């Protein structure tokens, strides 16, 4: 849905193979010192920067692309830091959701709707951030910003929010209108199925018979009373199949959003690390500590 391509201009992160014997190389180059300066005590940035630095870049196009991105990040660190914060908080919400274990499909769908609403909020935060004055100055981010705006339009956000609201009402006990077959030979046209226990009409008192007639003909003309156990079971299975299908739709949505925010956190995190390293080197230079290292 939304592609992140901030490390490779034509690929997602992770396409390149790692160097051979990465642990030995990291030790020989003393990368841990550089990585700590990049991470600023953020373990995720430490891990992501280590992962990126140990994957070689050989083609000239990617090298120029990375140079532009790093230059942007060093010049406008606050812009990249805010993007990283948005992605990190969104991933924290996703981890809260995935840590919950329940077999109840209604609960799963309800929680999926809640998470979608939260992620929609973070997508809007990101869109507003990409409209800021800082975004205008970050030239290397232009392609990403343009593509994101093309995919995440205001209409898309409104449609998704409206769909979430409609499904939330349904999960809280709203009515689902069906046009389908309930059982062999029984067709429903725009009807709501009510799972009611079978009753013997002849044993009802006059008041109950009147109440039943009002229910069927006045109060709920769309209702079909399932007075046979086989029909009830068919309706239950149909409802369960509908929930399973709905669950799969939301699972796919959530997977795409999770992949987007995960890649955004990893890739923007690398440039935040570069900005942190640039600050550290600048501070060392101001303190005249780098002059001692000059030949």
Regions found by a protein language model. Give the residues of each.
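Conserved NTPase motor "head" modules and their coupling/switch loops across ABC/AAA+ ATPases, GTPases
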Residues: 1-11, 20, 267-295
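Conserved amphipathic alpha-helical "coupling/scaffold" segments
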Residues: 1-176, 180-185
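Short, solvent-exposed segments of well-ordered alpha helices
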Residues: 103-106, 110, 233, 255-258
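Amphipathic alpha-helix face/heptad-repeat signature
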Residues: 111-115, 242, 260, 264-267
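Charged/polar positions within long, soluble alpha-helices
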Residues: 124-131, 191-198, 226, 273-276, ...
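Structured, charged N-terminal subsegments at the starts of enzyme catalytic cores
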Residues: 172-228
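Extended, charged coiled-coil "arm/hinge" scaffolds of SMC/Rad50-like chromosome-maintenance ATPases
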Residues: 222-251, 258
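Intracellular alpha-helical coupling/juxtamembrane segments of multi-pass membrane proteins
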Residues: 253, 257-268, 274-275
């Amino acid at each position: 849905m939304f592609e992140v391509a901030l490390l490779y201009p034509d690929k997602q992160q992770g396409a390149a193979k790692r160097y051979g014997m990465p642990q030995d190389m990291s030790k020989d180059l003393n990368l841990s010192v550089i990585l700590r300066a990049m991470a600023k005590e953020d373990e995720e940035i430490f891990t992501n920067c280590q992962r990126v630095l140990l994957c070689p870049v050989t083609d000239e196009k990617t090298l120029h692309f990375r140079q532009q991105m790093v230059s942007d990040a060093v010049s406008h660190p606050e812009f990249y830091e805010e993007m990283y914060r948005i992605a990190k908080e969104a991933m924290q919400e996703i981890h809260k959701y995935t840590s919950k274990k329940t077999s109840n499909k209604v609960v799963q769908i309800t929680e999926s709707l809640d998470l979608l609403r939260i992620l929609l909020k973070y997508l809007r935060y990101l869109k507003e951030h990409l409209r800021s004055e800082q975004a205008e100055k970050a030239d290397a981010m232009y392609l990403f910003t343009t593509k994101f705006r093309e995919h995440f339009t205001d209409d898309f956000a409104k449609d998704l929010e409206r769909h979430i609201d409609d499904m939330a009402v349904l999960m809280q006990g709203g009515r689902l209108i069906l046009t389908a077959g309930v059982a062999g030979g029984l067709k429903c046209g725009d009807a709501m199925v009510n799972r009611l226990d079978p009753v013997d009409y002849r044993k009802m008192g006059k008041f109950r018979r009147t109440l039943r007639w009002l229910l069927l003909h006045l109060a709920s003309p769309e209702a079909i009373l399932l007075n046979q156990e086989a029909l009830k079971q068919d309706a239950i299975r149909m409802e369960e199949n509908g929930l399973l299908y709905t669950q799969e739709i939301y699972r796919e949505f959530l997977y795409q959003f999770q992949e987007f925010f995960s890649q955004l956190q990893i890739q923007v995190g690398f440039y935040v690390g570069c900005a942190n390293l640039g600050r550290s080197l600048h501070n060392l230079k101001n303190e005249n500590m780098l002059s001692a290292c000059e030949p």
